Amino acid sequence: WFQESRKDPTGPYGDYYVWADDDKQYEDARIIFVDTEASNWTFDPVRKQYYWHRFFSHQPDLNYENLRVQEEILAALRFWLDLGIDGFRLDAVPYLYAEEGTNCENLPASHAFLKRVRAEVDAHYPDTVLLAEANQWPEDVVDYFGDYASGGDECHMAFHFPVMPRIFMAVRRESRYPVSEILAKTPAIPSSCQWGIFLRNHDELTLEMVTDEERDYMYAEYAKDPRMRANIGIRRRLAPLLDNDRNQIELFTALLLSLPGSPILYYGDEIGMGDNIWLGDRDAVRTPMQWTPDRNAGFSSCDPGRLSLPTIMDPVYGYQVTNVEASMSSPSSLLHWTRRMIEIRKQNEAFGLGSYTELPSSNPAVIAFLREYKDDLVLCVHNFSRFAQPTELDLQTFDGRHPVELIGG
């Protein structure tokens, strides 16, 4: 499309992208990839015009004002849905449209198009999930669920980005308050919708939605080496971020599986995979999955030089040591522990469907909360401190009920 658009401005693809004679429009839009892009506009020597891009210059933005572009996107969705996929992660949904005099984020036109997508999905593919990737504050993201009264008419799910850095912050500060405060500020969502919560993903651990002081603190604690940083975040995997500390990894995973929302695990974190900060940009955390100690970590039978990214050769995180095969053969492995925790979550509907109520705790290092759905009531207590901690909880409401330990047997 882009090659045709740049060659023939008056052709069928001429206005599939956003073109301009200069780079002066949309000056209120921030630059997202501050490490690599000096502008949201790039000059094309073929068409001799500038094209608009919110991310890399090799990722020109489609022109959603063009109804033919909308139809093309709907056709692409239908193609994959007809093949039987379960849903879509809708990347960067706040940036579909640009409008002069705005920051070009969260515009009404974006929501209008998402409603159209949702209507198409509901009409012909009713079991499909639309997951919004909107790196914004919860009060802005909640709009991507759509109309509250109707139960939601845009996306079924949306990532909750600000929770992630605050879990890391809470552990280093040994205080529940970073997590408690962001959850308290999270607005209610439509009844048929759900947050998607995560610890890490294929991008950097974003620090956009923290204060400058908090960002400096996170860099000092988790990314002392400048190579560990990218854009406004940290490009490391979960295990290296936590110094491969099994207790901390278990705490983070237990929080992921018990906080409100649907947990989204990043591949390899279940076996404690590492990263490669010598690779460029976001590739540090995108190395091949480590299945076995064999050639290419069992990921591919091709010549190693043909892999899109090299396997990790680190003595601690290298595929010869850290892999699924080795984890499966060890009953005490992180993989088996994670599977047991997921099974516990599945056995208790309160985690997936229940309400969330934080309980007052006498110890700031301890967060305690209830998950409740119908007759299923679960008390979760997490310790952010490095050491064992006492705490007092007021559980008089449950006098006469008998607690059953879910994990310890």
Predicted features, each with a name:
Residues 1-409:
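Active-site and adjacent substrate-binding regions of carbohydrate-active enzymes
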